[in-house]
Structures are given as structure tokens and as C-alpha cells.
Amino acid sequence: MDDVRLRIGGKQPIDGAAVSCPGAVDPVTGVVHGTSAVPCIHGIPLREMLSGRFGGVPVSIENDARCFAWGEQWRGVAVGKKHFTAITIGSGIGGAMIHDGNVIHGSHLCCGEVSNFPMGDPNREGGLCQWSDYTPVNLAKRYGKVLGMHLTGKQLFELADNGDETAAEYLDKFYYYTALGCILIQFAFDPEIIVIGGGGSARPGLLEELNEKTGK
């Protein structure tokens, strides 16, 4: 943040800042609750701290998936949509629910936390699986352990594209459980559309795979 302030502040005044971050973000108090891949931001007066770093300007913070949903509602595929769900596929699964044009936070700021949907093999080592276990990033970690090497989600895709049948089986789990998650969202929330973003959404043919898995 200091680097951003120095680079921008020397060219023009900073009037305010908006920050998206993982976790159960309380936009009113400016505190991040729950858990995420960035534990250092939880339970501290994050908005107040950021405002101080930027010279006391107003700062807004919100969950990253909700910011993605707002962006799609403003200038993306959800323009004109009043009821939709947005999910992001990265190291986990982010989610945001939009109803009557507004983000639903829920009574515990957890509405849209679809990453925790239980699914998969409950007897797998490590206990009950959840949707986030089936992202390309986490599937690559599991296959990497089998191979005895570090493997990224991108490398998992490359292995599958180059004929590695086991890698293809892991990716089939990604398609299957992503489709299952979308089906659960559709029946629970009945959105007009489900918007998919994040690094995992860049996979060519993803929508075709999901349509096949959902029987369309």
C-alpha cells in the first residue's frame, strides 16, 4: 500500500480507495471475519489502517467475489440483471448473491460462501470434501503429491491436453463438481444467470463441459 501511495500520490491527489479482499468482509465496520487464504487481514481494523496509510482518505472494503459481481452488473454480462449469482474459480470458490439488484450479505456475512458446499467423497483422507477441493489449483496439488512434484493448475491443464489420462480424470472432477455447484445454486437461489469468473474460468471449452455435465 505504501508503494501504491508513493507511485500515485506523487502524480495526483488520492481522494479515496476501494479494496476487495477474501473473507467475510463487513463493509460497515471495515473488519474482515471468518477465514481465507490471507489470514493476516482477519480481525483487524483493516479499513481504518488502510485509510491511515493513504493519508486519512475514505476507504471502502468488500469481499472480492462481491466486487466481481458488482463489476459484471455495472459493465459486464450481468448488465440489466436483478437476480444473479457470481462465482469465482481460483485457489478456492468465491461467490456472491445479487437479489433485486443488491448484494445479499446474510446475517453472518457468509451469504455466497459457496466454497464450503459439502460435496465429493466423504471418506477421502482429510475428512469431508467441499467444493473448493475441486478447483484446478487444489486438484493439481493432489495429483502433484501422487507424482512427487509441485504442480500448478495450469500445468494440470497442460498435462491433460498432452494426453495424461490421470490428469484428465482429475479435470473431469473439476468439471463435474463445478456443474454440481451451479445446479445447487440454481435450485437454492433460482438466479437469472450464473456468472463465472476467476482464473479457472479462462479454460477453453469450460462452458461446453459444464453444459454436458448438467445434461443440456
Regions flagged by a language model, labelled:
Residues 31-43:
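A charged helix-plus-loop insertion that forms the helical arch/lid used to bind
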Residues 64, 90:
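Active-site glycine-centered loops adjacent to acidic/histidine catalytic or metal-binding residues
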Residues 33, 104-105:
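Generic structural signal for well-ordered beta-strand positions
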Residues 40-41, 106, 111-113:
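A short acidic/small-residue loop/turn micro-motif
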Residues 94-98:
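Short beta-strand scaffold segments in enzyme catalytic cores
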Residues 85-87:
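Conserved beta-strand elements of the Class I
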Residues 21, 99-100:
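A cytosolic small-molecule/anion-sensing beta-strand core signal
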Residues 1-18, 25-29, 47-59, 71-81, ...:
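ATP-binding/phosphotransfer module of carbohydrate and carboxylate kinases, centering on a glycine-rich
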